[in-house]
């Protein structure tokens, strides 16, 4: 197996600490069936540390140190993920960085440093679809004394009067409701229980009824959750000419 040894240059997620790198590379290379191809790092994840000339140069220096100490080629240097694209496009990425692990920028078309649209990409590539299973006009504020909800939160409510509220067959066991943005700007995600999503449909651009499908754009976290939920069916749309 060809492997990359991950080293931590500041984000404090995965990766050995720099002063352990040589020992780990040497030990890994001694294992049967293992071919250490190079080193890599991860940024803009747990700690939100942005890729920079400084931490990328540090990664190159660590590779050079491990190469000199072990005699291994270590020709691959994986500088990070989608968050590295702005640095790369600026021309400031050290030339030794020859690999990036791109996910969100390709799938969702977003700059992961600020979630702005990435140039020449689309942001409508993934939809989360739920079906309306109940549709009722109800008050927008609960009746009676309130405390914590089912998830230990104290929720505040805005009085919008009587509203058309849909219950959809999607819940927190599948995705956090804050990670869903309605495709229809007239829809408002109000919240969710474990298996039900509550959406205000009063200002829907189209008429709705029980059985109507409601569509949402997911954030990266929403895509991660729904893509790994066994209760969410996945389907790939047929490519079409733009």
Model-predicted segments: where are they?
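Active-site loop/helix belt of alpha/beta enzymes
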Residues: 1-2, 8-127
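Generic secondary-structure boundary/loop-capping signal
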Residues: 13, 40, 97, 103-104, ...
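Short beta-strand-to-turn element immediately C-terminal to the catalytic PLP-Schiff-base lysine
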Residues: 16, 133, 233-235
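Active-site loop ensemble at the mouth of alpha/beta enzyme cores that anchors a bound cofactor
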Residues: 85-168, 174, 178-182
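C-terminal accessory subdomain/extension
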Residues: 139-242
């Amino acid at each position: 197996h060809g492997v990359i040894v991950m080293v931590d240059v500041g984000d404090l997620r995965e990766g050995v600490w720099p002063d352990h790198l040589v020992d780990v590379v040497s030990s890994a290379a001694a294992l049967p069936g293992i071919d250490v191809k190079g080193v890599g790092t991860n940024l803009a994840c747990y700690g939100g540390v942005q890729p920079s000339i400084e931490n990328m140069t540090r990664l190159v220096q660590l590779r050079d140190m491990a190469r000199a100490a072990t005699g291994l080629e270590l020709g691959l240097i994986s500088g990070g993920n989608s968050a590295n694209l702005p640095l790369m496009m600026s021309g400031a990425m050290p030339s030794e960085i020859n690999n990036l692990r791109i996910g969100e920028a390709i799938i969702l078309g977003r700059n992961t440093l600020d979630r702005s649209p990435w140039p020449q990409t689309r942001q409508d590539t993934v939809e989360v679809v739920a079906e309306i299973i109940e549709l009722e006009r109800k008050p927008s504020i609960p009746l009676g004394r309130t405390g914590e909800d089912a998830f230990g939160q104290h929720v505040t409510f805005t009085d919008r009067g009587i509203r058309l509220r849909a219950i959809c067959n999607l819940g927190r066991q599948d995705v956090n409701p804050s990670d869903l943005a309605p495709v229809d700007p007239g829809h408002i995600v109000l919240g969710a229980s474990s298996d039900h999503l509550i959406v205000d449909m009063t200002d829907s651009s189209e008429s709705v009824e029980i059985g109507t499908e409601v569509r949402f754009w997911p954030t990266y976290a929403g895509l991660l959750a729904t893509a790994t939920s066994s209760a969410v069916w996945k389907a790939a749309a047929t490519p079409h000419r733009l």
